[in-house]
């Protein structure tokens, strides 16, 4: 194989691999939980559909379409609102688009306020991004927070059941 063809082939293969590894940049993550709704958001590096497959079992069975806006650096921030949910119930969801079939995650909707059912929250300080130490937040969550919650409120290591809400106020306070 000639050097120019070999170079172009390597460039194509490496570029394709890099492209696919950069499609999902952030998330998915949950926002604006209420007893009957949940907003799922994620960020990609390409324009793609905004679809969440979801249901009350891992079989899923429902699809809801959403929207996206252009974020910083031309990233696309996707938003899908799930509606008609039952309070204090577990739901499973995943991103499903033309480029991504994501991992299945789960959440539990908050109880109705009048039920006065207890649930646990965590309030954390603004973590700020530190490019010199990008894994600090993940390390704190995985090495400290999750084991603490499981030990303190343990329910078979079911984080969605043990921890209902995480509040990171940032510059809001």
Q: Which residue stretches match the model-derived regions?
A:
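Bacterial Sec-dependent N-terminal signal peptides
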Residues: 1-23
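Divalent metal-dependent phosphoesterase catalytic cores across multiple superfamilies
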Residues: 22-173
């Amino acid at each position: 194989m000639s050097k120019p063809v070999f170079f172009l082939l390597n460039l194509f293969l490496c570029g394709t691999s890099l492209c696919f590894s950069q499609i999902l940049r952030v998330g998915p993550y949950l926002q604006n939980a209420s007893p009957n709704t949940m907003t799922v958001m994620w960020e990609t590096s390409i324009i793609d559909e905004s679809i969440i497959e979801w249901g009350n079992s891992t079989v899923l069975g429902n699809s809801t379409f959403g929207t996206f806006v252009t974020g910083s650096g031309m990233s696309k921030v996707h938003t899908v609102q799930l509606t008609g949910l039952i309070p204090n119930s577990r739901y499973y969801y995943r991103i499903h688009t033309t480029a991504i079939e994501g991992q299945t995650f789960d959440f539990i909707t908050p109880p109705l306020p009048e039920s006065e059912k207890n649930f646990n929250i965590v309030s954390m300080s603004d973590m700020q991004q530190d490019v010199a130490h990008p894994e600090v937040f993940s390390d704190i969550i995985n090495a400290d927070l999750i084991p603490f919650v499981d030990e303190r409120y343990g329910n078979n290591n079911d984080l969605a059941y043990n921890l209902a809400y995480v509040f990171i106020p940032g510059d809001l306070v």
